[in-house]
Regions:
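Exposed extracellular interaction/assembly regions and N-terminal maturation sites
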Residues: 1-64, 94-104
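Generic detector of low-complexity/intrinsically disordered segments
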Residues: 25, 69-71, 91
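Terminal beta-strand-rich extracellular "head" domains
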Residues: 64-82
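Extracellular jelly-roll beta-sandwich "head" domains, especially the C-terminal globular C1q domain
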Residues: 76-104
Length: 104
C-alpha cells in the first residue's frame, strides 16, 4: 500500500485526510501547521511525515496544543533543515511528539 504523498502543498495546515501520509517539499521554505484539537479533533495515533527535499528549511508550527521534540522535551515550533525528514504523532488529545533527522 505504501505511504501516500502530498507534493509541495505550500504553506499548509494538516487535515484529517493527512493521517498516514507524507508531505513532500522540493521548492521554497514553507510552514506546516498542526491545528489545535479544539479546531480539528484529530484522533490519538494520528501521524504524518514531512520530507523536506528542498535546499531550505521548513517550519512545523502548532497552534494552542503542545508539540514535544523527541529526546529533548522542548516544546513549540520546530525547524526541519534542508533535506531533513520528520514524523509527528498525536499522543494525547492536545499533545504531539515529533522526531527526525535535521529537526531542531
Amino acid at each position: 500500500m505504501g505511504m501516500p504523498q502530498n507534493t509541495n502543498p505550500g504553506t499548509y495546515t494538516i487535515t484529517a485526510a493527512d493521517n498516514g501520509k507524507h508531505l513532500y517539499y522540493t521548492t521554497t521554505a514553507q510552514t506546516v501547521t498542526i491545528p489545535a484539537n479544539g479546531t480539528l479533533a484529530l484522533p490519538i495515533g494520528f501521524s504524518f511525515v514531512i520530507v523536506n527535499a528542498a535546499a531550505v528549511s521548513t517550519s512545523i508550527a502548532i497552534t494552542t496544543d503542545t508539540l514535544l521534540l523527541a529526546g529533548v522535551g522542548t516544546t513549540g515550533t520546530r525547524t526541519l533543515a534542508a533535506y531533513g525528514m520528520a514524523t509527528a504523532l498525536k499522543i494525547t488529545s492536545t499533545s504531539w511528539i515529533i522526531s527526525g533527522n535535521g529537526l531542531t
